């Protein structure tokens, strides 16, 4: 089948014909052998062909013998020259029997052709025998055109041309024989030839001239000059028996680097000057990248110009670049023995993006000589490979002049000649910092703790403000093993130590001038057993028991008072300080970490410490007030690896910032609910400090909804709201007030489960925070659009104020992440709420859901629903989906007039794209333009079918666009209102 298919393919090139014998070219007698030697036999004659050239012919016409006689004519021996099949083209004329006057019944109008193979010219007049065997019959030839002889006229007729195929041949040569058995004919010429495939170049592959040995013959090709094979086996093509190449796809050769295909893929041409080709392939030559050149033809790479370089990791097609210039505007901030350097990026980055910085330090003596700084100095995050334009340097000695050289580097800096340019800065430390703390004493030790004390050093610039204790286990190496403790007294208790372990301790003091240097390391050791401290522990147990009894009594009294207040139908309020809290009915009570004398104790109590070696940070996914938010992996021994979210505390933090950062972990660690973000643990014993929580794949709810606008059903949205309400019910039962409930603080996992997050961070935003969501109010930052009016005015945060915020979250969810109150200013929002205006229902919002929102926005906080009631109401809606099909009307009751956000008049938009962006459908701007909807006149006629054709497949998006078009039509009617102004101006 494959061979038959190859024979059916069209040919790639014309076949060549190689002549073995052509009587037209013979000028002497042919002297072919005839048999028998009798009268009436074949006769050799001379004649003229159609072109009046002299040719040798044979004629026969024996009509005398009735019954016919076989007349044989045999050519000379013809070498086949490797041909397997030979073609014979015979030119002859044949007399019509009826036109012959003496024609007998044995007159024929045909003759027969035979051939005989032999290894040499061995035939004689009698051998081989003149019969069909040993001769091999080729064909009996009949004339298509007969010559007629009319009385008194010359014979007329056409020349017959017949081509026969001989073979297959296997011996060195052959004879061709003609047998006449009663015909009157003339053999005008004989052309013996064979066919072969001519040489061929296709797809950069050369195939030689080939004589076919079989029906089809595979021929191996070779790549043309400057081409290389790219496939194994080498490319091949089939030569057919008729001398034609079978057409098939030829692949396997491509031009070498520095060469491109040309002349219809027949040659590989060298790339010209100024161009190059870096790899093997069919691509064209490319112009040299920036700052490079090629002076020679056939270049696989362009060389960099003087002063420009290409890094080893850069591809050959990348431009050549230079090292960056020096950083600019280096400034320093000195705080005692700690220095922070900051600088601006260099003017010239060298054309690269892998910019890093390196800082070198030299200590200059009064005599003028400068030496490298000592090993006691530390750089944070390091002296080299800095990606941010700052570095913190610790361990500076007082009254010393330092020279810091800041250099910018990139991927080609190591290839450049000479050192990189740098920007120097000289810093002289103050001599006023406290001296090193020495004479550390162990006043008491136990198997897990050490109590140390030391003499108060003399501070030249005033009193010592506090101390920093640095300690680590002897033999432990690396920054993760070092711990720090701050104390305001000249004593410290080191807790959580290993039994019978040796520790190295250093202390430094801080005055108004900053920190002094650390003193010499002091060796201390914990006890092996507890025999020496049992008395202290016994006293501690007794004291704890007494305190516990007192606390139980106080809690019981508070619970009774709270139950009485609840029986009067009034909600218990929470003060601004979380330390005042209630006991829930059989529920664990939230404890404010700031009620602890040492907030770090709250972290140890409620958050699990995780070894930093179990944590792997994979990528940064966001940034917060205190540092970066990353995605990573947690692999604790004996547990399955899990994906976690990691909040990190940025460098240069104060102790207050560290305490407030970790307070969120102290809060989160007290909660355990499927709709509350789960705390995995904290990393506090290494830098950076981390908080690890479960990873929520879909991120914040507001951005997730905006990204999937119109893609969720009402039931799905109500299910999300039910999960949020369930989490808030749990927090309310634990007597915790969130204060910052908003869709941005709700996280969504891959199963669309919503979980409440962000416990505490928003309460610590500083006054100079740039986040526009939070506005200053009575000394703190408040998210105005989500906060109840009593909380804005009097900072009275309660579970009822969280209910108000929950109503705003409901509106955000049903509007797919729309910003509450749109572009109204915060002051306009406050004024509108004071005048009892409320948000209108989002598009297609069920009436029951908007009514629940209005209930949450009651001015009287005691009239707002509690979270158990909210959960119950949402459960009823989910069980009765028909209630969600009643869509809210865009007007409110008498007690709750609704804010009106009318769409501006379409004439206010400069283009269709601007209109699409205004209705949050800007993603379809290019699709509208490509489909011809470029004017409002055309857009006003758009239909749902048009939207599908454009590519708007989401039903929610179709509704929004068609509703806006309908509004546009109403605006175009005569007398229609203009409808200008923002939402804050139209109530």
Swiss-Prot record:
Bilayer disposition of the protein: Single-pass type I membrane protein
Residues carrying a glycan: 203, 335, 426
Limits of the SAM domain: 907-971
Alphabetical list of InterPro entries matching this protein: EPH-B4_SAM, Eph_TM, EphB4_rcpt_lig-bd, Ephrin_rcpt_lig-bd_dom, Ephrin_rcpt_TKs, FN3_dom, FN3_sf, Galactose-bd-like_sf
Boundaries of every Eph LBD domain copy: 17-202
PROSITE patterns reported for this sequence: EGF_2 (PS01186), EPH_LBD (PS51550), FN3 (PS50853), PROTEIN_KINASE_ATP (PS00107), PROTEIN_KINASE_DOM (PS50011), PROTEIN_KINASE_TYR (PS00109), RECEPTOR_TYR_KIN_V_1 (PS00790), RECEPTOR_TYR_KIN_V_2 (PS00791)
EC number(s) stated in the UniProt entry for this protein: 2.7.10.1
Any GO BP annotation: cell migration involved in sprouting angiogenesis
Single GO cellular component term: plasma membrane
Function per UniProt: Receptor tyrosine kinase which binds promiscuously transmembrane ephrin-B family ligands residing on adjacent cells, leading to contact-dependent bidirectional signaling into neighboring cells. The signaling pathway downstream of the receptor is referred to as forward signaling while the signaling pathway downstream of the ephrin ligand is referred to as reverse signaling.
Protein name: Ephrin type-B receptor 4
Organism whose genome encodes this protein: Mus musculus (Mouse)
Encoding gene per record: Ephb4
């Amino acid at each position: 089948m494959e061979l038959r298919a190859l024979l059916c393919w069209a040919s790639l090139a014309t076949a060549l014909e190689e002549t073995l014998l052509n009587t037209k070219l013979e000028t002497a007698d042919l002297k072919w052998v005839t048999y028998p030697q009798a009268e009436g036999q074949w006769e050799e004659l001379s004649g003229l062909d159609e072109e009046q050239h002299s040719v040798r012919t044979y004629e026969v016409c024996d009509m005398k013998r009735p019954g016919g006689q076989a007349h044989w004519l045999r050519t000379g021996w013809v070498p086949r020259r490797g041909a397997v099949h030979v073609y014979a083209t015979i030119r002859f004329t044949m007399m019509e029997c009826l036109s012959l006057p003496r024609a007998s019944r044995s007159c024929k109008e045909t003759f027969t052709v035979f051939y005989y193979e032999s290894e040499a010219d061995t035939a004689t007049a009698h051998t081989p025998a003149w019969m069909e065997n040993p001769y091999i019959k080729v064909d009996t030839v009949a004339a298509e055109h007969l010559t007629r002889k009319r009385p008194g006229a010359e014979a007329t007729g056409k020349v017959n041309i017949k081509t026969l195929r001989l073979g297959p041949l296997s011996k060195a040569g052959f004879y061709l024989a003609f047998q006449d058995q009663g015909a009157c004919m003339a053999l005008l010429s004989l052309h013996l030839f064979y066919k072969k495939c001519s040489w061929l170049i296709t797809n950069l592959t050369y195939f030689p001239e080939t004589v076919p040995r079989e029906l089809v013959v595979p021929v191996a090709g070779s790549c043309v000059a400057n081409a290389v094979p790219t496939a194994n086996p080498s490319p091949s093509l089939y030569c057919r028996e008729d001398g034609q190449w079978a057409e098939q796809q030829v692949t396997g050769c491509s031009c070498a680097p520095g060469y491109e295909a040309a002349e219809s893929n027949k040659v590989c041409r060298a790339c010209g000057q100024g161009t190059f080709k870096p790899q093997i392939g069919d691509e064209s030559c490319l112009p040299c990248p920036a700052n490079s050149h090629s002076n020679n033809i056939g270049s696989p790479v362009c060389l960099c110009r003087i002063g420009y370089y290409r890094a080893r990791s850069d591809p050959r097609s990348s431009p050549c670049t230079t090292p960056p210039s020096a950083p600019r505007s280096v400034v320093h901030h000195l705080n005692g023995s700690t220095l922070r350097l900051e600088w601006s990026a260099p003017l010239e980055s060298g054309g690269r993006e892998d910019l890093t910085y390196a800082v070198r330090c030299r200590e200059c003596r009064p005599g003028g000589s400068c030496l490298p700084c000592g090993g006691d100095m530390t750089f944070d995050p390091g002296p080299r490979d800095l990606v941010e334009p700052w570095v913190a340097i610790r361990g500076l000695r007082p009254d010393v002049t330092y020279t810091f050289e800041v250099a910018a580097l990139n991927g080609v800096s190591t290839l450049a000649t000479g050192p990189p340019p740098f920007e120097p800065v000289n810093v002289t430390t103050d001599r006023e910092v406290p001296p090193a703390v020495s004479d550390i004493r162990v006043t008491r030790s136990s198997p897990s703790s050490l109590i140390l004390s030391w003499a108060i050093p003399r501070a030249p610039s005033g009193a010592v403000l506090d101390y920093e204790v640095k300690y680590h286990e002897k033999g432990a190496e690396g920054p993760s093993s070092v711990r720090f403790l701050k104390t305001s007294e000249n004593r410290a208790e080191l807790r959580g130590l290993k039994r019978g372990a040796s520790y190295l301790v250093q202390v430094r003091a801080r005055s108004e001038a900053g920190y002094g240097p650390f003193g010499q390391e002091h060796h201390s050791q914990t006890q092996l057993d507890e025999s020496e401290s049992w008395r202290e522990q016994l006293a501690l147990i007794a004291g704890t028991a007494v305190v516990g009894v007192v606390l139980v009594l106080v809690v019981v009294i508070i619970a009774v008072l709270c139950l009485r207040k609840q029986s009067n139908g009034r909600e218990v309020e929470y003060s601004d300080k979380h330390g005042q809290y209630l006991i829930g009915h059989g529920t664990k009570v939230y404890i404010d970490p700031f009620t602890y004398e040492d907030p770090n104790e709250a972290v140890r109590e409620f958050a699990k410490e995780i070894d930093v070696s179990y944590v792997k940070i994979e990528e940064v996914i966001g940034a917060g007030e205190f540092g970066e938010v990353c995605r990573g992996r947690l692999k604790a021994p004996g547990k399955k690896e899990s994906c976690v979210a990691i909040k990190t505390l940025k460098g240069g933090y104060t102790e207050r910032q560290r305490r407030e950062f970790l307070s969120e972990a102290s809060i989160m660690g007290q909660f355990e609910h499927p709709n509350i973000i789960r705390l995995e643990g904290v990393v506090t014993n290494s830098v950076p400090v981390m908080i690890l929580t479960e990873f929520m794949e879909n991120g914040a709810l507001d951005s997730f909804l905006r990204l999937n606008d119109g893609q969720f059903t009402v039931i799905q949205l109500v299910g999300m709201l039910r999960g949020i309400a369930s989490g808030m019910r749990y927090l309310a039962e634990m007597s915790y007030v969130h204060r910052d409930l908003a869709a941005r603080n709700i996280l969504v996992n891959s199963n669309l489960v919503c979980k409440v997050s962000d416990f505490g961070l928003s309460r610590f935003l500083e006054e100079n925070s740039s986040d526009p969501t939070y506005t200053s109010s009575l000394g703190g930052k408040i998210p105005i659009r989500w906060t109840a009016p009593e909380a804005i005015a009097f900072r009275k945060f309660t579970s009822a104020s969280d209910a108000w915020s929950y109503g705003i979250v409901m509106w955000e969810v049903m509007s797919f992440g729309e910003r509450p109150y749109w572009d109204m200013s915060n002051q306009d929002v406050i004024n509108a709420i004071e005048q009892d205006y409320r948000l209108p229902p989002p598009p297609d919002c069920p009436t029951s859901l908007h009514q629940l929102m209005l209930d949450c926005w009651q001015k009287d906080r005691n009239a707002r629903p509690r979270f158990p009631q909210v959960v119950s109401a949402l459960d009823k809606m989910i069980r009765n989906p028909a209630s969600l099909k009643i869509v809210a009307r865009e007007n409110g009751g008498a007690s709750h007039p609704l804010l009106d956000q009318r769409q501006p008049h379409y004439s206010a938009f400069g283009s269709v794209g601007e209109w699409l962006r205004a209705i949050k459908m800007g993603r379809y701007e290019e699709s509208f333009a490509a489909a011809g909807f470029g004017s409002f006149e055309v857009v006003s006629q758009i239909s749902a079918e048009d939207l599908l054709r454009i590519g708007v497949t989401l039903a929610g998006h179709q509704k929004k666009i068609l509703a806006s078009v309908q509004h546009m039509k109403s605006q175009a009617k005569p007398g229609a209102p203009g409808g200008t102004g923002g939402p804050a101006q139209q109530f």
